[in-house]
Amino acid sequence: MPVVDQNAIELPPRISEASVADYFALLKPRVMSLVIFTALVGLMIAPGHVHPVLGFTAILCIAVGAGASGALNMALEGDIDVLMSRTANRPIPRGRITRGEAMGFGLTLSFFSVMTLGALVNWYAGGLLAFTIFFYVVIYTMGLKRRTAQNIVIGGAAGALPPVVAWAAATGSLSVEPLLLFLIIFFWTPPHFWALALFRSDDYARAGVPMLPVVAGPDATRLQILLYTIVLVAIAAAPWPLGYFDWVYGVTSLVLGAGMLVLAINVYRHRTGSTALRATRRLFAFSILYLFALFAVLLLDVLAKAVAPLIW
């Protein structure tokens, strides 16, 4: 017969200390903003007319799906986030949200974003969004990040898929153009994140994450940054001579590519001291501008062509 301690204190149920801002932080809003922008470009360059309501629904679902991926990523990485200065102030390491709450939040958003996109737009896009979430959470976060220095290279496919999903939402199919956007983002990802990893290598080493600078060393990472940047510049410029994007995009890609290449060469050349740190930080910052400007030109070109008949 069980013995009941009459003097035991009954603890009240746990009350979550999380605020709306904490749940919003789980969505990784900076990453989400880039996803929204690249997806918008994928939607806008698609042929034909997309009803504004369906277009808005598609972008919203892609954004929510990206946020859901971020929440699930944080739920799965709470143990390493607490060890890294860059992530130690996130809601889970600070104890404001539990990993279980973040997991439930992410799974709920994942379900509704995929189902809404499929039901209201088309299931081709819905399926691609589901695959994107699965790839980021299961393949990258659970499978690759803690096991291989190529985590960013392979996992970068998830971050490159939003414009493909948006194109599929607009057309119900795939074509060369969204695949070109995919390749640009895919080859942009390693130089961008390896530049970050170079000046955050102590963080990754402390958390046991096998980023390339930790596993292969900074010099090998600098070489890989340079090689991937060369490939990126070539792939980003290719759509112009191939006839997919016009000369405005082509010239912009060459100018921006020259900037990326110069900064990548500087990272490769400067290997010690404050000069090396400054070179990696400059490349990291410019890489964000590079991708934004490249996609902005495509978006502005579409808008200009839409407005021109109204003016002339």
From Swiss-Prot:
One of its GO terms (biological process) is heme O biosynthetic process. GO terms for cellular component: plasma membrane. It is found in: Cell inner membrane. Pathway: Porphyrin-containing compound metabolism; heme O biosynthesis; heme O from protoheme: step 1/1. Its EC number is 2.5.1.141. It comes from the Bacteria. GO terms for molecular function: protoheme IX farnesyltransferase activity. PROSITE patterns: UBIA. HAMAP family: CyoE_CtaB. Belongs to the UbiA prenyltransferase family. Protoheme IX farnesyltransferase subfamily. Converts heme B (protoheme IX) to heme O by substitution of the vinyl group on carbon 2 of heme B porphyrin ring with a hydroxyethyl farnesyl side group. Carbon 2 of the heme B porphyrin ring is defined according to the Fischer nomenclature. This is Protoheme IX farnesyltransferase. It comes from Nitrobacter hamburgensis (strain DSM 10229 / NCIMB 13809 / X14).
